[in-house]
Structures are given as C-alpha cells and as structure tokens.
Amino acid sequence: MKKNYLSPLALLISATLFSTIVSAEQSSTQVVDALANMDVKINVIDNQAGEHGIDCAALGADWAACNRVDITLTNGFDAIESDDWALYFHSIRQILKQDNPQFKITHVTGDLHKITPTSQFKGIKAHEKVVLPITGEYWQVNYSDFMPRWYATSGDALPRNLKSTDTQDPTQFVAPFELKNWKRVGADNNVLMTAENRYQKNTALNALSEQQMRGQILPTPLDITLQQGDVDLSKGINLHLEGLTKEELTVINEHLQQVKLKQNNQGFLVEGKIIPNQFAIDNQISGAYELVITPQKALIVGYDRVGLFYGMESLLSAVSESEKPTIATMTVKDKPRMEYRGVFLDVGRNFHSKQVVMRLIDQMSRYKLNKFHFHLTDDEGWRIEIPGLPELTEVGSQRCHDLDEQTCLLPQLGSGAENNNMGSGYFTRDDYIDILRYAKARHIEVIPEIDMPAHARSAVVSMEARYNKLKAAGDEKGAEQYRLVDPSDTSVTTSVQFYDKRSYLNPCLESSKNFVNKVVSEVMQMHEEAGVPLKTWHFGGDEAKNIRLGAGFQDKNGAIESGKGIIDKQIEDKPWAKSKACQLLIKNGDVSDFDHLSSHFAKQVSEGLQQEGVTTMQAWQDGLKDAVNAKDFATKNVRVNFWDTLYWGGFDSANDWANKGYQVVISNPDYVYFDMPYEVNPSESGYYWATRASDEQKVFSFAPDNLPQNAETSVDRDGNQFTAKSDKPWPGIYGLSGQLWSEAVRTDDQVEYMLFPRILPLAERAWHKAEWENDYQAGREYVGGKTQHVSQQNLANDWDRFATIVGVKELPRLDRAGVAYRIPVPGAKIENGVLLANLSYPGLVIEYSLGESDHWQTYSAQHPPKVNGSVKVRAKNALGTRTSRVEIVTQK
C-alpha cells in the first residue's frame, strides 16, 4: 500500500489553517478528523464502589458488584461544535451509569458502546478536557480489561480510529493503577506480585546441577534408568527409523535443528523399529515405546508409529544444551498416561494466523500432545471457508463499522472501525487442509469446533445477509434454506457476552439442521481430501442462556435481598421462549421445556454425525446437561470438556459426568485456561473470572485425576484456602486440555506469550503421573492449610527438576523454533543499598538499569551491584533477542 507523508512543518501549517476554517457548519469529515485526534485517558477510581457508597444493586449490577472509572477526553487543535457524531468504544463491562449530562452512553451490542452528545452538549473547545464519570459492572483490575481502537463517526464520513487508542498497548490510554485498585473486593487475599514479592517466591527454587540434568526428558517417562557415561553427538546422528512416513521423517529432521543436531551418515547411530508384540499387555497402548542408548547406538522400539515417533522425541529431549551436545546412556520404558492430551485455540474471538497455528502444532508434537481442539467460530467471527455459503466468510469473518451488518459484523474486542487487524480473517479451504496434513505428520488429531446453538452470532448474521440478498433477488426458497432465526421470535435475552437473541441459532428450525448438515459435510470433505478422516466433531453447546435470569439478579417486583442486582426480570426471556417453532416442539411433546432445547439439538446433531460415520461427538459439558447420560446420543463416544470452576464445586461435579458414561476431558478454567493471567499484577494480560493467576508452577501442581487434592496446593479466586471432597465414585480421567480463549489476545505474539511455557507443564501432567499425585479416594477431604495428604516436599523437588529443565533446555529450543514465549519477570529487592534479583527459571539473563536511563547492564548474583534510588530490572532470553517486561524496584 502506498503512503504519502508530510513534513512536520507542513503538518503544523495544515493544522493551523484547518483550525482557522472550522466553523459552526463543520463537515462530517472535519468532525471525524477532530474526534480522531482526541486524547483518551481512562482512570480506574474504585473497584469496590459497592463498599464505598455506590448502590450497585439499584443500578442492576450482577451480584451488586460495580466499579467507578473516569474517562477523560482531551481535544486537539479543532473545536467540536457539531452534535452529529458518535464515539464508539469497546467495554467488556456493562455500563450502568454515566454522570456527565452533556453525553449519553448507549450499549450497541456485545462489548460495543457509543458516546453521543445530548441536548445539553455545549461543544468541546480546542484543547478542552471533558470527563465522563462512569459506573460499570464488576471490576477492572488489569490493563487488558480496556480494549483499544475507539473510533469516531459523523454523518456519511468514513469512520476513523482515535489515534490515542490505536495501539496494542493499553497503558498508552489507561492511567497507572493505584495500589488500592488491584483488588476486586475487600476480602481479596491474593498477593500482588511486586518485584519484592516475586523475589521471595523465587527463592524457593533449588535448581538442578549439571550432573543432575543428565538424561532429563520432558514430559517425564514412566520408567527411566540412567547408565554411566555419555555419548558425544557433536558429529550429529545417523537416523535409521523403519516404519515412519516421509512426512514424519521430515518433522524429525526439523526437530533435530531445534536441539542443535544434524543428520549425518557418520554420526551416532539411531535405529528405530515398530514391534508391537514386544510390549506387555498393559503397555500395548498407542504411543508406547522403549528406548535404549548405549555408547554404540540408540535403539527405539515403538508399539506403533506413534510410539516410534515419541521415542525419537524423547531422545531429542534428553540431548544436553551444552556447547558440545551429549546424551546420557540410559534405558527408558514409556507410555502415555492419558489418551487425550490437548490444546484448545480460539480463533473466533480474534483471528490468528496459519503460521502461529502451525508453530503451535509443531511444539505440541515435541511434548507428545495429541489433540488440537480448533475453535473455528464464535459470536465475533466465523473463521473457515464453507463452499456454497460464501457469506460466512464474506460477512462473518470480517468486523467493521456497518450498523446493518450486511457486509461485516460490528467491531468487537478492540478491533475498531476497520477490518485490517486480527478482528478479521479466516482460513481458506486449502489452509485448513494444509493444517490437517501438517498435524497428521505430527500425530495430532484436529478436532473442529463449530459452536452452537449459542455463540453463533457470526453464523446468524451471515445467514441473515444471505437471506436478504437472495430474497431481494426473488429466490425465497433459497433464502430460507439455511436461515438460522425464527422471525416470530421476539425473546428478550442477554448472552454472557452481552448480545441479544441473534447470539443463538434457533434449534427448532429445519433450516438450522440444513445449515449444520451442510457445514459438517463440507468439513468432512476437507478431512477426506487431507487424508485425515473426521473422527471427532465438537458441537460447542456452552452458555445457551440469558444471564439476566441468573442468580446474581433479583426482580424489582419481588422481595429484595442484599448482594444482588435489582432488575425487571419479568421482561426477560429464556432463549427461544417466544419462537413459535420452539413453542410448537414443546406443545407436541418433542421437548419438555425451553431449558432442554440445547441438549435436544445436540442429540439431533449426534444422529447426523453418526450417519456420516463420525464416531465421537464432543461438547462443553453444560451443552449436554439436560441429557440423561451419554447413551442419549447417537455417536459411539460422547466426550465433554469439563469446565466447572474447581473451588465452586467442580471437584465433585466432574464425577457426575464420568459416572454417566461421558469421556471427561478436564478443562478447569482455574488451572488450565491459559487466557488467565500468569500472576496477580495489572500489567499481566488476561481475564480473571476463574482465577487471578495461573503460572507454570500452578499448572504443574495440578492433579487432574484427583480433583479434591488441589485444595491443598492452590487457592480460590480471592486467594483463600478452600475445602474439597467428593463421596462419589470416580471412573477416572479420559484426558486433559489447556485452553486459550482469545477475547484479550489480538496478535500472534500474544498467542504464544499466553500459551508458552504453560503448555509444558500441561504436557507433563497429561503424560506423566507424579509421585505426589494421590489416587482418588471417595470421602477423603482435603482442607487447604490444614490437611497434609499431599507430600509438599516431593512436589517442591519435582518442580525444581522441571523448572531447571525448562529454563536450561526447553526455552532455548523454543527460541530456535521462533516461539515468542513469555520471558519471566525478575524478582528483585534492594537491601542495604545492594540489588538482589532472581528468576523463576535458571538459564536466563537478568539485566538492570539505574534511575530513568535505559543503560542496561548484566546482573551477577555472585557480585550484586550497589545501587541508589530506583532501579529497573528485566530478563533476557538466552539468545539475547527478547526481554521480559520491565519492573521498577525502589529501596524500602
């Protein structure tokens, strides 16, 4: 794209002339230009407004929780006299009240709101500041709560993003948080992760010595015996792997480079064979392998091709990171702990590139993760091309300012007025086939998710655009074929993300079934063409509800109790309650009530999948909650992602799903949702509705097959101990999955920051059961801070081992693979004028800079520097190419 630039002098002259000619009759373009140059500054005033005199309940706040924020708009050179304009902005919190009478804030849809002038608007003079005091629902404790890319409109002028918010860095338009505002509630007992608190936490790490690092493999094998002596690999390795495909061998050769090895006919001999009958019955599992390394050669025996591939990955994992690569002589017998070892990636909320998807899949294979759950659609975007339904990508994959939504979806999640960022985008048919083949070569199953019946707004809007186009062309029958709404449905609903009834496709329409059948058929054809038959279909199914009928609200016409928002519940409906098509289903006895519609629809989808030969239907568990058990569905297997928050009862309710015959994939948000922040600090990005923080150590300490145990090793959202017990039988876990939802993830670098290195402890828990993980016992109670069923010393020792492997070996390998993982922020304190600093991982470099300068020096723990005043610290990766965020330390 060609761009023309003006000199600073020309810009100044232009601005002066422009300011001179602006009059009361400003053109729409002039108004938009003036608004686009406004400076926006958001200041969090009080996150506990309900405890400080604001009647949050009367304002209708869920659970009577609200916060106060000031928005300050500072005008530029040009006065704004017109009242024909709007400022659109993204707010993940419902706006309850705005106290400047010159302005009105209106909720548009989802997180999109607009500011417009009222009849009391007096204009905004050049350089004038105006303040909009806002009361919003819940709280806002992280910078990432505030979305970028406000934009301005006026008349028929093209909308423009406000320059001050057109950034990926919210600190550019959000004022620094005061210490009092990092807590959600007064009873929040989480520890704010300052440099000093982080230093104290990091002191617990006891890194392994170089000798102790011999033969360490991630994920940890079932059984490993080290022998005396190491093998020199400086000449490379000579691979002879029988039974692997050409594509699999290509992957292995690429992974050689990540551990600084090369294929060489004169190198160390590595032989591989597939011999299923060599394995005992208990070890006859896909992915099982045996590895023997002697001074003469290495021999890998796989139970199957997957096992041979994994055996080779274990060999590469064992290679040292020393300048002269070596490997310990050893014997390994290994098999996977769980059948399902997964990673979920949401590309619906924000689009992520094919390249970052492939990098993720490649690293999954290195750590023996085998299920890629691909969340391809959501309210905010449809991300896969479906031949025959071009509107899904022409409209549903794009976000821009079109109030009629005939050409795109309305902006959401900081995407702004235009479609030139990750709010827009999709995978072509060929892209998806490429991803399938890429995953196949790495023994990873791609599980597509087309979310329904809720979270379907991108599909609903797209099919309405299709309906309007075909109807205008006179094709009434074609227009109705895939329509997803019942025009008779006047239900008043609010989805979890603040959309209206168009967030849900109507499960009672034949046209909705036509749509599902069409999409399934087209995706199946892509799988067939890729040589990867579709085995698992993810139905989605989550959150088909009206949040304003939830327990945090009460009806203004009933008895009023404290702690709940007061609203008019009588005007609220359950989804589809006023749809004549759904009313008829209930009247005819096909469905018992509106609550059962989602599960009823899931049953119908499962029947279609079974007829197409798909053996497994997967869903978020709440989408199937009204079924009796797994036998209600037609597919051979029915699998659920179990995502109840553990401390709110998930330690017990998981058993119900397993006992009903579902394959349970543990996906608890308070442990393995990787869109949650790494630590309790406003600068860490992420949502925090389930937990204030989940760092690598918390993921590592998670016991997925004995959920009550986690009460002894973690705290709840408010940093408090909790108690967990279940009296029910527990048939056992089917799998473990880590999730990255993308509401606050807008770039590929942010994807990798949030996923890595948390994926590594996820892989460890999915593959290997640690000694400190207790077997489940019905009736055993775990009380945080009191009971001692878990060996905390064994857990600490295991973490020391794992953290050393990650810091010394795995992070440099991620660097070589081009993965933009999160570099840990140093812990630091100044004691008696001396800077003390440390890290959560060994192997990285700490740097410091004195005062306000950016003169960075390497920190030495052996010779800590004497300092005066404030000091900035940061960590740098081993390659010296990237750094952590900067933390400031001052003398206490």
Range-by-range predicted roles:
Residues 615-830:
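Flexible, acidic glycine-rich loops studded with aromatic residues
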Residues 100-140:
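Intrinsically disordered, low-complexity Pro/Gly/Ser/Thr-rich segments with frequent PxxP/GP/PP motifs
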Residues 146-306, 310-336, 617-626, 822-825:
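Acidic, contiguous N-terminal accessory segments
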Residues 784-892:
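Short, compositionally stereotyped local motifs that mark structural "simplifiers"
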Residues 493-497, 502-637:
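Active-site neighborhood of glycoside hydrolase catalytic domains
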Residues 76-109, 148-150:
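Short acidic, flexible loop segments centered on an aromatic residue
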